[in-house]
Amino acid sequence: MNELAQWLNLQTEKHIVLGYGSLLSKNSRERYSNIYTQGIPVTVSGFERAWVTRSLHEKQTYVGAISNAHSQLNAQLIPTQINPALQEREKDYQFVAVNPQDLNFHLHQGDATPSLEERLSAFTFWICETLDCEPASEEYPVHQTYIDTCMAGCLEHGGKEEAERFVAQTSLWDHPRVNDRANPKYPRAALIKSDISNNIDKLLANS
């Protein structure tokens, strides 16, 4: 039995959110959403990630998932209840069900088998699709601490290659950006060490 199958056998929640933004960060989801389960890296087909989610109340722009049959994005399986705390965090999105056949576990050895497919069918998978797509602007910029939170989660769970996937599988990087590391403005920012920030800067510079 591979790691993924073992992980699925341990889950008691039947709902699994496909976290592709700040939920990628273990630190952020634990501190702000009380989600303490370990995430599993996955690639989701049928959705494009882009800088299109405008938060009117937070005056920022976040990544969002848009239905696109020709695109894919990297994410993490996050078992959790769809509770008020999570709904508040994701209030600029709608929860959309995803077919298990659209999930690719590229970081785990072993191809999909009938037994694995059977295990996956026991869960309902959800992705947060953007309700209203608006690109970042000077009034609603992207904040560096949000980018850091997303990419630190990728580095933690999948290393440099997973962080590179986040950059490559996200559209509209040409946007107004605020470097708020000295005074974080993103309200669910992860606690990130300076060496991780430096790695993120290098990855962004090379993209």
Where on the chain are the PLM-derived regions?
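A glycine-rich, hydrophobic/aromatic-adjacent loop/helix-cap motif
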Residues: 1-207
